[in-house]
């Protein structure tokens, strides 16, 4: 199962458990649902939360454009428009939109329970960006794994690195772990040994300024062989050059105790662009991280910014979010892991 969920979404001809959230329009209608690839054949539609498998021709169908159709009388959960787009604020359950009104926010499993997972065949024609393989920049870590030497991997980041809102984080079926656990488990499998220690010191809601303040305790003290750094989502109001300086500090701090520490810098996914509070400079940080990586040996950039942008060309933000603001669901958690694993090759 693990190898299937980590099969890159940009390869192959079968999409496995791609998440979709069915939401009504304001008039109560439901549009055909665009999948990441135009589907040729639907193999399965299910709820990952309940395990219910829905029936072709009764609950759903496939249209001539490769979209998923929700049929009248379907058992598939359909979320009412007014349950997402709110007229009034609900304390701790909503955020203000740019154009007025409010959007539903939840970290209690609301979105996970409402989403369905679609497995389908497609033509395998991916025209979007493919993450760059940068294993040559991480040669020391690759060599340690190849020789099955003890390896210490540190994940330092915000709530996405903690695991929000993967189902394991929510303590709900199917209990998918955070991307950090997925990545390390896959490395153990690929390289055939268990002596890869994972340390995750990430904390939700934190930005790169906090990362600098906590660097000694949460990063330097561990002296990792490989560090995977995931800050930026909560830096939306931070100027890109200031963000770059903060990340530079972290690079130099960890290398002050281990000059051979190699680093993967994660360019973050995008927040919900409808919200005033979180949308900001996140899309600009890729350039800063790429520039930093060019200035030091042993640093690669895992580009989730571009990958998420590619996914959003065909899929709704609601299809891939765990909280409707700035967290992954199971599907996007898997994509995070896929991008990091591809970057490491």
Ranges and model annotations:
Residues 124-200, 214-223:
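Serine-esterase "nucleophile elbow" of acetyl-processing enzymes
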Residues 189-194, 256-258, 295-298:
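Short helix-capping segments at alpha-helix termini
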Residues 152, 197, 261-264, 300:
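Proline-centered loop/turn at the N-terminus of a beta-strand
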Residues 154-156, 162-169, 203-244, 268-272:
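Oxyanion-hole/transition-state-stabilizing segment in secreted/luminal serine hydrolases
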Residues 230-234, 253-285:
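Active-site segments of SGNH/GDSL-like serine hydrolases
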Residues 2-128:
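Extended beta-strand solenoid/passenger and fiber regions
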Residues 268-345:
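Catalytic His-Asp segment of secreted/periplasmic serine-dependent ester chemistry enzymes
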Residues 242-250, 281-286:
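Charged helix-capping and loop-helix junction motifs
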